[in-house]
C-alpha cells in the first residue's frame, strides 16, 4: 500500500534547498530587493567600502543622549520617534545602514523606510550593543 501522506525524499531535499536559498538571499550582494539584518562585522565592512559614497548614510535612531554617549563613527542621529517627520529629507535612492541599541527601534524604522519606498536599507543585527561586543569602534560626543 502507498502512503499518500509522506513526501518523497527528493521533494524534501528540493524543499529544504529552496527554503535555505530563500533565507540566504536576504543578505547584501544577493540581489534581494528587500535587504534586512546584517551582522556588525558585515556592517563594518560595508562602512569601510562605502565611506566615500555620498549616497551612503549611517543612521543611529536612538535618542540624542544615547547617541552622545557612544555611536558608530560617521553616523548621524535621527531619533526613531521623529523619523517619520524627517523621512522626506532623505534620498530614497540612497543606501542606509540603521541601528539602535539592540534592534527594536531600528526594526520599526527599517519597516517604515521600506514602506516609504527606500530600497537599500540595512539594519545592524543586535544594534550598537552587538557592535561594541565585537570590539568595533565607537565615537563619543
Model-found features: residue ranges?
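Rhodanese-like catalytic fold shared by cysteine-dependent sulfurtransferases
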Residues: 2-57, 64-95, 104-141
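Short, surface-exposed ligand- or partner-binding patches at beta-edge/loop junctions that are enriched
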Residues: 99-100
